[in-house]
């Protein structure tokens, strides 16, 4: 199915509960395909791997208004490049990473938008800080002037019943954080992927990350 049809299907499905941001999860998607996605109106692209993302940014540098999000695991030695080349980093999970991003962002015009990744499902295969660590990490980030904390991100459990509980807990955590004066301007709850984005929207997600449902199954060889 062409990308235009896939996108139209998604837009129809979310019409009653549109998110603030439809993030195209573009891991292993070619720059030329992203150029086509841009022509269809998509502006936010989420990348998992630094070098792959940098290559695409170079190939698409003629396009105005593209917003690059990093959504993968963060390696300490990559923080400087992430801070310089991305508009958002959505997988901050500990103070050290936040501090390194802050230091590397110094001198740039705008602060780096960041989300705290929360290990809400308890699965070892997924990154993120423990839910009980979120308030302390959020406070630490709020003190770093070159970062702007926008909210929380999570990947929920793949089983529907557990996913529902995870979505609910994430919404509760987000709204509780938002009630504190220092975090009153938080505006982003990023959760929901191709398999569960409608369920996520029912639980107040403001950003959904869609890959397979837009681009089909991908492998690294697709590039």
Name what the model sees in each region.
Residues 1-195, 201-203, 215-217:
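Conserved alpha/beta-domain cores
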Residues 205-223:
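Gly/Pro- and small hydrophobic-enriched strand-loop and loop-to-helix capping segments
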């Amino acid at each position: 199915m062409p990308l235009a049809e896939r996108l139209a299907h998604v837009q129809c499905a979310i019409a009653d509960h549109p998110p603030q941001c439809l993030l195209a999860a573009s891991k292993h998607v070619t720059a030329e395909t992203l150029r086509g996605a841009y022509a269809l109106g998509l502006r936010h692209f989420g990348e998992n791997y630094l070098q792959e993302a940098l290559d695409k940014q170079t190939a698409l540098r003629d396009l105005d208004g593209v917003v690059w999000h990093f959504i993968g695991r963060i390696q300490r030695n990559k923080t400087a490049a992430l801070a310089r080349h991305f508009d958002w980093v959505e997988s901050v999970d500990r103070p050290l990473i936040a501090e390194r991003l802050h230091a590397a962002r110094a001198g740039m015009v705008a602060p780096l938008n960041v989300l705290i990744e929360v290990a809400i499902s308890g699965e070892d295969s997924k990154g993120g800080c423990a839910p009980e660590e979120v308030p302390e990490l959020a406070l630490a980030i709020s003190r770093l002037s070159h970062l702007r904390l926008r909210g929380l991100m999570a990947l929920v459990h793949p089983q529907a019943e557990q996913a529902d509980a995870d979505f609910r807990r994430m919404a509760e955590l987000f709204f509780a954080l938002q009630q504190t004066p220092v975090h009153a301007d938080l505006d982003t709850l990023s959760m929901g992927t191709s398999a569960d984005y409608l369920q996520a929207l029912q639980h107040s997600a403001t950003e959904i990350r869609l890959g397979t449902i837009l681009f089909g199954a991908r492998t690294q060889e697709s590039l």
